[in-house]
Amino acid sequence: KLLDDLGVEAVIDRKAAGYRFWADEHTQDEGEWRRLGKDVRAFVGDDPDIVFEHPGRSTMGASVFICKRGGTVVTCAATAGYMVEFDNRHFWMKLKRLVGSHFANYAESWQANRLIQLGRIQPLLSAVHPLAATGEAARTIHRNEHEGKIGVLCLAPQEGLGVDDPELRQRIGEDRITLFRRHGG
């Protein structure tokens, strides 16, 4: 229900599908990459132009493989290991690009904030904690027990005190702003 409310059209759950991109700790399984590619194409009709890669070692080979010829793999982390490995033939022979990203620079951050102020995008919080509970909030993130974003109130005793455009907030709607919380995030 949460994903439907966010407008997600298709989801492939790696765990539920049982993908094993590594046959053992030294050998990747190209057959599993092909299976993932087939599943992606079944949902969207083509190979993806852009693949957002987060886990790192466990999935980089598959991400490079399924990315469309001339497409881009964007990596923004490496939670499953920083030492990635992939078959370079699937990279250079198909003219793919690899882009590293760590969110944004100052100008991009300013533009993202501007889009928030215009109501074009809405940051979705699953939980907000008082400053005294920062340790618990960090522990929740460290254990990956959260969905979406978590906020910490630094200079405010309660939520809502930083709202400087109530009309925009009303236009966006509390139901959209609190979407993750309503779904038990």
Please provide the spans of the model-predicted regions:
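Rossmann-fold NAD(P)-binding glycine/threonine-rich loop
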Residues: A78-L95, Y106-A112
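Short, acidic/turn-prone active-site loops that include or flank metal/cofactor-
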Residues: R14-R20, A77-G81, F103-A104
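Short SAM/SAH-binding signature in class I
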Residues: P48-F52, G71, K149
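Terminal peptide-recognition signature
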Residues: L3, V51, S63, L98, ...
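C-terminal hydrophobic helical "lid"/dimerization subdomain
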Residues: R35, D46, G61, Y106-G185
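Helix-to-beta-strand junctions that scaffold the AdoMet/dcAdoMet cofactor pocket
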Residues: C67-K68
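Glycine-centered, small-residue-biased loops immediately flanking beta-strands
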Residues: G71-T72, K96
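Adenosine-nucleotide cofactor-binding segment
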Residues: K1-S58
